[in-house]
């Protein structure tokens, strides 16, 4: 079974602290590495996390404020240095194309990796392929900003006791999957009676924003909702003026979305203890954690979920 986890590579906002680097978030999932908003120093954070950067296959930039993208250039150069053979897909708001190019080509180096750009100029499904469906929606920030929902496909799971009772095994199982029915000893057996659909898991990544309807749409029933909460309620006036959320607001959005787990991040440097965010949000949404540098949040596949 492939590794399925969120790894926090950084969880500060614009200004890093002694214990928190600028944000960067890695989802290891279905043999891919999904890297979100690599801030300054992300390449080095991989070393401290003891994770090979070569796992990265897709990079998502929510918007082009520096703390969400300054690590992009060095990450691409590192992947180039490591001679990765898989393509690197990059997703970002189309309005930020010039900033993407500046980050990618800001220094002299010989690029040999294959970078596939996905500049996004409209909301909805960005890609739908074997491993994932990628959805983007606009958030409410000071510049064009995207939130993300990543969903794995549904899968058909056989019900072991029914398969055993029917006496099915071997190649006929593939026939059953392909044709949705088989005939055994003159009796027709149907796939729908011997199996169930396992709904694919979803994760949501909510970057800088005020509360808005897109958040609930993206995080609906998500296994993990990774969400910015730059401020505590005592500084809600700052959150509003800078187009950010408080921990309480993030928790309210998670509750409305029916998310299973909320991971708060993007903490202002004014706060030394991120546990205060957990306490504030936990009054509304109990299954909440304040992100910690290099902490891992597994979300193992539940084979019996329907």
UniProtKB/Swiss-Prot annotation:
Keywords tagged on the record: Endonuclease, Hydrolase, Metal-binding, Nuclease, tRNA processing, Zinc
Entry annotated with the keyword Transmembrane helix: no
Xref: InterPro entries: Metallo-B-lactamas (IPR001279), RibonucZ/Hydroxyglut_hydro (IPR036866), RNase_Z/BN (IPR013471)
Domain of life: Bacteria
Any one GO MF annotation of this record: zinc ion binding
Biological function: Zinc phosphodiesterase, which displays some tRNA 3'-processing endonuclease activity. Probably involved in tRNA maturation, by removing a 3'-trailer from precursor tRNA.
Protein name (record): Ribonuclease Z
Source organism per UniProt: Chlamydia abortus (strain DSM 27085 / S26/3) (Chlamydophila abortus)
């Amino acid at each position: 079974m492939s590794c399925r986890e969120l790894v926090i590579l950084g969880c500060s906002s614009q200004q890093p602290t002694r214990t928190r680097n600028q944000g960067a978030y890695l989802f290891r999932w279905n043999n891919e590495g999904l890297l979100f908003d690599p801030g300054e120093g992300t390449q080095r954070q991989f070393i401290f996390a003891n994770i090979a950067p070569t796992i990265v296959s897709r990079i998502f930039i929510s918007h082009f404020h520096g703390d969400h993208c300054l690590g992009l250039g060095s990450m691409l150069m590192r992947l180039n240095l490591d001679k990765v053979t898989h393509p690197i897909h990059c997703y970002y708001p189309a309005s930020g194309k010039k900033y993407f190019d500046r980050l990618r080509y800001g220094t002299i180096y010989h690029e040999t990796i294959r970078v596939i750009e996905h500049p996004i100029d409209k909301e909805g499904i960005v890609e739908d392929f074997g491993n994932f469906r990628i959805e983007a929606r606009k958030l409410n920030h000071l510049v064009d900003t995207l939130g993300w929902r990543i969903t794995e496909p549904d899968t058909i799971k056989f019900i072991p006791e029914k398969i055993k009772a029917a006496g099915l095994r071997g190649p006929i199982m593939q026939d059953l999957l392909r044709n949705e029915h088989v005939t055994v000893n003159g009796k027709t057996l149907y796939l729908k009676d011997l199996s169930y659909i396992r709904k694919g898991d979803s994760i949501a990544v909510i970057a800088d924003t005020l509360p808005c309807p897109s958040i609930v749409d993206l995080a609906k029933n998500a296994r993990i909702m990774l969400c910015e909460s730059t401020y505590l309620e005592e500084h809600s006036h700052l959150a509003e003026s800078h187009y950010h959320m408080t921990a309480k607001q993030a928790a309210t959005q998670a509750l409305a979305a029916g998310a299973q787990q909320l991971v708060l991040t993007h903490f202002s440097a004014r706060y030394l203890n991120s546990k205060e965010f957990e306490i504030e949000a936990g009054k509304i949404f109990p299954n909440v954690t304040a992100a910690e540098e290099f902490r891992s949040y597994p979300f193992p596949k539940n084979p019996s979920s329907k």
